[in-house]
């Protein structure tokens, strides 16, 4: 997506970055701090292949930073970039809205 959306509606840009059901959950997990691949895989309950694909995409788009340590066995950690961290207030708003919506569903038995 990099550069192909230059000059397009910001909502379209955000939608394309966050498409799929895992992007927000990955951002939420990394917003809590640096994580290893297996930690993300376990915490989010996502398949290895899907997580790998999503992290590569998010790294390419500048939201996630991947750090490889020269150790044996290799250690790789993922964290949010400065741009990824700028999404934190949006995550907070989504969480508040989600909590309110859950209460709405309970009250209205939907």
What do these predicted regions represent?
Residues 1-2:
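Short, intrinsically disordered or compositionally biased N-terminal tails of bacterial proteins
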Residues 5, 65-69, 84:
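Residue-level detector of alpha-helical hydrophobic segments embedded in or interacting with membranes
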Residues 5-50, 77:
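N-terminal helix-turn-helix DNA-binding core of bacterial DNA-binding proteins
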Residues 23, 35, 63, 96-99:
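Generic structural signal for secondary-structure transition and capping sites
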Residues 28, 85-110:
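Amphipathic alpha-helical dimerization/coiled-coil segments
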Residues 37-69, 73:
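Canonical helix-turn-helix DNA-binding module
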Residues 70-94:
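Basic, amphipathic "hinge/linker" alpha-helix immediately C-terminal to the N-terminal HTH DNA-binding motif
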